[in-house]
């Protein structure tokens, strides 16, 4: 079993010193490493009260001050991101941290990232599926041939840098819909469940859906 922390780079009410808040977050990650925790994840937001629009940048700074702890984006709002740049950021973090990078891909809990980056929120699910497939293609292949609906095609182009870990861990972050659990299982991706209040027992049937979908797709438990 591994024990870790998922956190945000938030500004407390009445606090306006963003530099101080980020430095304190990096200090907390360093302390978690010293205490022997296994992972530390940072979420992504594009709101006034958060400073974590670029979790990989914060995690890269933390990588320089830690030795063992795994560093994860949790979650990266993949629906509103470019999978090429996302993979490059993940791979760069993996190089800086000497193989400690992980990523949790999610659709996001807030909508502001979509208009900010030129996407329509009504394409929420379709964007995520297309971009997740491209991200996994990039992870598996140095040279990529790809075409889709929401991004220009990639015609046998190499994507660098490549990470130390092969494959670099990519998790799927899900909320409470059976479809999301089934998708993660069918794709053979590890699962991060966002439990925001309520009774945790309600997630057991969803975990069963995840495991059954993985089994039917031929993936190991």
Tell where the protein language model's regions lie, with residue ranges.
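Internal, glycine-rich beta/alpha segment that forms the wall or movable "lid"
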Residues: 1, 82-189, 201-208, 216-217
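N-terminal beta1-alpha1-beta2 module of alpha/beta enzyme domains
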Residues: 1-70, 166-168
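Hydrophobic faces of well-ordered beta-strands that scaffold small-molecule active sites
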Residues: 3-7, 40-42, 71-73, 101-105, ...
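Active-site beta-loop-alpha junctions enriched in small/polar residues
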Residues: 8-10, 45-47, 76-78, 106-110, ...
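Short, solvent-exposed loop/turn segments at secondary-structure boundaries
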Residues: 15-19, 51-53, 83-84, 116-118, ...
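The substrate-binding groove and active-site-proximal loops of carbohydrate-active enzymes
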Residues: 16, 72-80
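Active-site-adjacent beta->alpha loops and helix N-cap segments on the catalytic face
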Residues: 51-58, 198-212
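Short helix-capping segments at alpha-helix termini
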Residues: 66-69, 142, 213-220
């Amino acid at each position: 079993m591994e024990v870790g922390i998922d956190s945000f780079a938030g500004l407390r009410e009445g606090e306006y010193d963003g530099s101080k808040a980020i430095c304190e977050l990096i200090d907390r990650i360093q302390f978690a490493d010293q205490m022997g925790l296994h992972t530390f994840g940072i979420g992504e937001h594009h709101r006034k009260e958060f400073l974590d629009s670029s979790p990989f940048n914060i995690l890269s700074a933390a990588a320089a001050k830690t030795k063992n702890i795994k560093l994860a984006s949790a979650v990266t709002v993949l629906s509103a991101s470019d999978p090429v740049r996302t993979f490059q950021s993940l791979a760069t973090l993996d190089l800086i941290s000497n193989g400690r990078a992980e990523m949790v891909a999610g659709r996001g809990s807030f909508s502001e990232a979509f208009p900010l980056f030129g996407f329509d929120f009504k394409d929420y699910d379709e964007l995520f599926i297309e971009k997740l497939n491209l991200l996994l293609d990039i992870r598996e292949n140095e040279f990529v041939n790809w075409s889709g609906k929401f991004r220009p095609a990639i015609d046998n182009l190499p994507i660098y840098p490549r990470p130390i870990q092969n494959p670099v861990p990519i998790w799927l972050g899900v909320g409470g819909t059976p479809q999301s659990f089934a998708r993660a299982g069918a794709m053979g991706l590890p699962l991060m469940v966002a439990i925001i209040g309520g009774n945790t027992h309600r997630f057991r049937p969803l975990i069963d859906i995840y495991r059954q979908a993985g089994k039917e797709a031929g993936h190991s438990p």
